[in-house]
């Protein structure tokens, strides 16, 4: 769990160095509100991004939505993309779904279907642009104004302040408002406090691993192996925990661990060793049991889709 805050122009010029010294793990920064107009940019956003980057604070962003229909939502999407250009957040980008000032209610609150479609329009557009996307909502909005099942693929930032723990599954929990005791050194609204949050997902690791939000995707790990056809040593993305020949008694099970971005195939070069079906052991990791049923020596091979078949080691059954 990481502890964080969310801030906007109302927090003034945040002392990010002091906030970091107090143990701040992340920040969610308001970048603006409504349609794509410069007059609706948050005047503190650019500074907050610079200061978070300078102090090593992972950050994400949010836009307060005034959209009444998917057409409005497309403008809000462009607003986000304009302000995010050239920046590399390590947390998702959220659409803030609420009606704090009554704007939507005064104009006829859109239906649940329309509000859900507004979120989908923005989040899908963010994902198409390479960002992790999500939405912010409180309990009332989740229960009466949005359809969470249709938004399950997006990060959920849940506003449920002043309770011991959230009453529904969420990725980020807004745990306190100033009115419920939320405070953070360097970030408190003058004469008040600060919104505080907790993240149950290690988003910095996920963003880097998946190459989202402008971060380069790390190259897949490789391991040298002998190509079966040419006999040349090549690099394969199927990394084994076994690189030397194996010798086991007849009937003994040997477990091979494979790490690969795609599910590889494992085969024996001849009879004598049973290669059991692969079983998943986490993301991009598989286990394969090898059992010798006839004495002798057998080559064990792997193949990754798009790569050559490789001889990995010899399995001797005694």
Per-range role (PLM):
Residues 129-144:
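Aromatic-lined carbohydrate-recognition surfaces of secreted/lumenal glycan-active proteins
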């Amino acid at each position: 769990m990481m502890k964080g805050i969310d801030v906007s122009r109302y927090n003034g010029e945040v002392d990010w160095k002091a906030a970091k010294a107090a143990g701040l793990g992340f920040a969610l920064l308001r970048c603006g509100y409504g349609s794509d107009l410069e007059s609706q940019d948050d005047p503190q956003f650019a500074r907050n991004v610079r200061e978070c980057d300078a102090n090593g604070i992972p950050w994400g962003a949010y836009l307060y939505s005034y959209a009444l229909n998917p057409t409005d939502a497309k403008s809000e999407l462009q607003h986000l993309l304009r302000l995010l250009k050239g920046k590399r957040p390590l947390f998702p980008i959220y659409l803030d779904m609420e009606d704090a000032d009554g704007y939507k209610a005064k104009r006829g609150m859109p239906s649940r279907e329309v509000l859900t479609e507004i979120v989908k329009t923005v989040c899908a557009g963010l994902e198409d642009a390479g960002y992790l996307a999500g939405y912010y909502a409180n309990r009332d909005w989740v229960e009466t104004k949005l359809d969470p099942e249709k938004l399950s693929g997006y990060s959920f930032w849940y506003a449920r302040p002043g309770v011991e723990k959230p009453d529904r599954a969420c990725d980020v929990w807004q745990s306190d408002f100033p009115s419920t005791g939320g405070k953070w050194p360097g970030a408190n609204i003058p004469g008040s406090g600060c919104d505080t949050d907790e993240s149950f997902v290690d988003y910095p690791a996920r963003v880097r691993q998946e190459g989202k939000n402008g971060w380069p995707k790390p190259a897949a790990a490789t391991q040298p192996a002998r190509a079966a056809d040419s006999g040349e040593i090549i690099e394969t993305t199927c990394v084994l925990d076994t690189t030397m020949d194996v010798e086991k008694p007849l009937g003994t099970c040997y477990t091979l661990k494979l790490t690969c971005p795609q599910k590889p195939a494992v085969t024996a070069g001849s009879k004598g060793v049973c290669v059991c079906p692969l079983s998943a052991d986490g993301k991009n990791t598989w286990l394969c049991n090898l059992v010798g049923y006839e004495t002798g020596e057998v080559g064990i091979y792997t193949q990754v889709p798009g790569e050559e078949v490789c001889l990995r080691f010899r399995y001797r059954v005694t």
